[in-house]
Amino acid sequence: MAAKVEPFWKRKTLAQLDQDEWESLCDGCGLCCLQKLEDEDDGSVYYTRIACKLLDLQSCRCTNYAERIRFVPDCIQLTPAQADEFQWLPPTCGYRLVAEGKDLPLWHHLVCGDPERVHKERISQSGRMLSETQVAEDDWEDYLIFRAG
């Protein structure tokens, strides 16, 4: 009987992941691509329903991932070196969970094999977002959905 091999996210640190493993941790929820607002009084960060102009509002994937920095210079590029800063990511985020030493949820595509499950379980905001091109920045506060952290 062959020994059961633990999934890579359970046996490796973020720094040990290769590029494919790193990219596969993304569950495709698109929440990191939503615009966020910071409370000037206490520094709290709030997610809005307003998505980056490059985010596909249904699939929750970037429409130009390879060149996103060219079109959105302030696009956040997650790296293993930033793991201690991942608390702003949603508590369901694969990057954050692995950084915190936790397992991936049952709906994560690496666990269940279904990349659409993140949408079926309504973890993503698929179909519930607006593009930043549709809403004036002064109105983003009207579209708050949750507090980060």
UniProtKB/Swiss-Prot annotation:
Q: Which InterPro entries match?
A: Puta_zinc/iron-chelating_dom, UCP006173
Write down a Pfam family by its short name.
Answer: CxxCxxCC
User: Which HAMAP family does the UniProt entry name for this protein?
Assistant: UPF0260
Q: Which family does it belong to?
A: Belongs to the UPF0260 family.
Identification of the protein by name: UPF0260 protein PA1299
